[in-house]
Amino acid sequence: MNPSEMQRKAPPRRRRHRNRAPLTHKMNKMVTSEEQMKLPSTKKAEPPTWAQLKKLTQLATKYLENTKVTQTPESMLLAALMIVSMVVSLPMPAGAAAANYTYWAYVPFPPLIRAVTWMDNPIEVYVNDSVWVPGPTDDHCPAKPEEEGMMINISIGYRYPPICLGRAPGCLMPAVQNWLVEVPTVSPISRFTYHMVSGMSLRPRVNYLQDFSYQRSFKFRPKGKPCPKEIPKESKNTEVLVWEECVANSAVILQNNEFGTIIDWAPRGQFYHNCSGQTQSCPSAQVSPAVDSDLTESLDKHKHKKLQSFYPWEWGEKGISTPRPKIISPVSGPEHPELWRLTVASHHIRIWSGNQTLETRDRKPFYTVDLNSSVTVPLQSCIKPPYMLVVGNIVIKPDSQTITCENCRLLTCIDSTFNWQHRILLVRAREGVWIPVSMDRPWETSPSIHTLTEVLKGVLNRSKRFIFTLIAVIMGLIAVTATAAVAGVALHSSVQSVNFVNDWQKNSTRLWNSQSSIDQKLANQINDLRQTVIWMGDRLMSLEHRFQLQCDWNTSDFSITPQIYNESEHHWDMVRRHLQGREDNLTLDISKLKEQIFEASKAHLNLVPGTEAIAGVADGLANLNPVTWVKTIGSTTIINLILILVCLFCLLLVCRCTQQLRRDSDHRERAMMTMAVLSKRKGGNVGKSKRDQIVTVSV
């Protein structure tokens, strides 16, 4: 191998670090303490408020008074820092940063709505004119005109068929209906004088119950006065229409499809041919159609009606009664007479007057009904909170039991400007919902128990050190607990999820309360009192729920119950369906959940508030006793003897040290006395005094 090859295979030389100063400098800066990491539960603190600083100053002053320390600016600052340090230095258990406590919460009157169904009780609908339309009256609606017509998108569920009006599947169709009264006349050519009212009503599909016999249909017949067999006679005041509820001989079907079967037992008056006693063929069918192609045109354009026939005209299904629809399938619900007051106000009503005359044509009697109209009456119907009207392109899906509507409007009143190209859905505010709420601490029934528990954790975790700290600062456990309680409440930061629910529910509470305020000018009216009673009934139901529940101390507008949320038992899809208002087999079983929550609340009610916390404090104070520490160590006789010998040895050692210190003190005292005597002599005796001092000290 030649030298050149040996040189190529030689290992490379190591580079020398000429300047090691930077490394040394970095080594000097290295520390072994743990780096302060930002935990997930760490929150950005807000600047202290004036009230917090004032309270902190009061606590510091009280602490200095208890410890009998002079109040100076320095001592006040140190006391305040100690109080803050005491509050923020409470130990956090392992894994508490990632802990997540989820409980069931009851939120009353959330910002949610649900559809009014055929199984709900009738609602109050107010009209502005009780002369032509029966029912409660209120001519001061709407209460907030500036809020009428607000846009909204809805997607809600339902259990029973919802109440909907309009030309759409699942909604009751509108139609024109007539109500007629007659006044007998003595004229030889005029049989009767008629007064008739035409207005928007509910459209019948068939005249009689479909798929039901007469006998079977009678079981759905409501209790009430049967309609008269004669046409009601006009009262003396021709400007007043007397309404009298009655039950017709047969019912009409308003709806019979997959959404349910809805019937009405109110009379549906129309003109018929009276064929009794006629020998020739007599068409007994009704003449005036029950349904017009254009509803508004039939009420606006046609101001004259003339019916002619060789057979006498008779008004069928007599009676002046309003429609009262009710559902009979798949469930049976109550009557809803209030729906007609909404439809009749969607267009003005028309007032007719006329008569039936008798003539002779071709030697046969000829009957003519002549009706004319020149008077219309505009109407307005309104509902009051918690009820509202959703107007727009409403779509009801029976398969999924959902109702959707995009770009709809929220209204409380309907008048003659309404367009029947839209649909009307009755909705109301939700009385309350059950939702899971997460917190970063366990459920507590009162703030005192929460604070005592946290302080006691810190005391017991550092009991042996904390006892000497208490002795050093001359501060008792009661003072520490009181200080931590007040300062902890002042510096407390709520959980974000609870804050979200709180703000969510607080805004809706303000909204419903503002809408439900009763006008002082109408406070004496009986209708407002009735609506207030309905509203107060919902409030009482909510209060009844809250009185039965044991709630967490840190919430006021809604109730966090002690029932832990079990995701495996109630998955979030069930909660979502509950929020949407759907009640099917997959929806949250509210009745079962209420039973579980009430049982959990009763279990917490059996405990006297504060008893458990006070018992914990007593146990904590017992653990602070040093004698208990010795007892735990000295559990055998041999160890006890050893401890006694150690104590005697320590006592003997203390006695010997005390005697030695006493001798040294006596020697120093004698020396000082000798020095004092010598200092009084003159200079000639100084040497002697020094020798005497030396002799005295050496003795």
From Swiss-Prot:
Record-annotated membrane-spanning stretches: 633-653
Site (Cleavage): 465-466
Stretches assigned to the Extracellular side: 90-632
PANTHER family listed in its UniProt record: ENDOGENOUS RETROVIRUS GROUP K MEMBER 113 ENV POLYPROTEIN-RELATED
Physiological role: Retroviral envelope proteins mediate receptor recognition and membrane fusion during early infection. Endogenous envelope proteins may have kept, lost or modified their original function during evolution. This endogenous envelope protein has lost its original fusogenic properties. SU mediates receptor recognition.
Oligomeric form and interacting partners: The surface (SU) and transmembrane (TM) proteins form a heterodimer. SU and TM are attached by noncovalent interactions or by a labile interchain disulfide bond.
Protein name: Endogenous retrovirus group K member 19 Env polyprotein
Organism: Homo sapiens (Human)
